[in-house]
Amino acid sequence: MSNYIKTDGASTVEAFVEVQLIKDGNYIVSYCPALDLSSFGNDEEDAKEGFEEALSVFFDELHKRGTLEKVLLNLGWGLRKLPVASFEPPEEKYLKKHPLNVNKTFNERLLIPVN
């Protein structure tokens, strides 16, 4: 399944994104190229939990500021207007490549309540 972001425009953002786990010294970095968003932890589970929190804060802040659409479009996402707004990820060639070796990749799907 490919990356997507959907929002009802009022209270919920649903995100499904690919996240890379990268060993960097004593830490594991969780990095999402499609959002240029990262977090880290002492182990994989800690890095995944940190990424979930970062993703939640990211969408909550964008929603509060009313800049979700603008930021996603600037990151290369495409907007489709359906009954709810749906964003398609940028093409692979536009994604930033992380300079470190990717150890593992996982998909993160979250339903994020936004205020």
Model-derived regions: residue spans:
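Short acidic, gly/pro-rich beta-turn/loop elements at beta-sheet edges
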Residues: V29-Y31, F40, H63
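Short, charged, surface-exposed hinge/linker loops at domain edges
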Residues: M1-F16, E49-N115
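Short aromatic-glycine-(Arg/Gly/Cys) micro-motifs in beta-strand/loop hairpins
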Residues: A15-A34
